[in-house]
């Protein structure tokens, strides 16, 4: 059971990293298309990650 939880945690972590990288690339492409206009957007990933970790290891 612990191995399954570790595997799921690893998949969640890698998925979050790849999603972040894709969003950064998309934002860079949008910035190039808009002529250098910068759009600031704050992303908050830590809350869902902490709750997922708590549910995996807590019960």
UniProtKB/Swiss-Prot annotation:
GO terms for cellular component: extracellular region. InterPro entries: Frog_antimicrobial_propeptide. Residues 23-42 form a propeptide. The keyword Secreted applies. GO terms for biological process: defense response to Gram-positive bacterium; negative regulation of nitric-oxide synthase activity. It holds the Pfam family FSAP_sig_propep. Residues 1-22 form the signal peptide. The keyword Secreted applies. Expressed by the skin glands. Keywords: Amphibian defense peptide, Antibiotic, Antimicrobial, Cleavage on pair of basic residues, Secreted, Signal. It is found in: Secreted. Belongs to the frog skin active peptide (FSAP) family. Temporin subfamily. Antimicrobial peptide. This is Temporin-CDYe. It comes from Rana dybowskii (Dybovsky's frog). The lineage of its organism: Eukaryota, Metazoa, Chordata, Craniata, Vertebrata.
């Amino acid at each position: 059971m612990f191995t399954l939880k570790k595997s799921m945690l690893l998949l969640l972590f890698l998925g979050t990293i790849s999603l972040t990288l894709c969003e950064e690339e998309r934002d860079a492409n949008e910035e190039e298309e808009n002529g250098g206009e910068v759009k600031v957007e704050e992303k908050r990933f830590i809350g869902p990650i902490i709750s997922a970790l708590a549910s995996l290891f807590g019960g």
